[in-house]
């Protein structure tokens, strides 16, 4: 019986959390991307999810393609929010 509980605990720890509907949070985008067949009005498609749906991000999200922060002349208040 203890072996069964151990197996269930390991199985639950390995599985990704279940989210209702067909939305899956895309972890590599800082938990900000949602996989959808089509994005809402205030969202922009960015890359694709594993299930070939668009990864939708809020329109105010700024993504750096180069992987390094760009040096701009913007003041701190005018910068876009950073993804963790």
Curated annotation (Swiss-Prot):
Name the chain's protein. Answer: Beta-defensin 119
User: Where in the sequence is the signal peptide annotated?
Assistant: 1-21
Which key words tag this protein in UniProt?
A: Antibiotic, Antimicrobial, Defensin, Disulfide bond, Secreted, Signal
Extract the InterPro entries matched here. Defensin_big_dom (IPR028060)
Q: What is its subcellular localisation?
A: Secreted
Does the keyword Disulfide bond belong to this entry?
A: yes
Q: What is its main location?
A: secreted
Disulfide bridge positions per record? 35-49, 39-56
Oxidoreductase in keyword set? no
Bilayer-crossing residues are: none
Under the heading Pfam families, the entry gives:
Defensin_big
Species name for this entry? Pan troglodytes
* Family designation: Belongs to the beta-defensin family.
Q: What does this protein do?
A: Has antibacterial activity.
- Show the GO cellular component annotation of the record: extracellular region
Any GO BP: defense response to Gram-negative bacterium
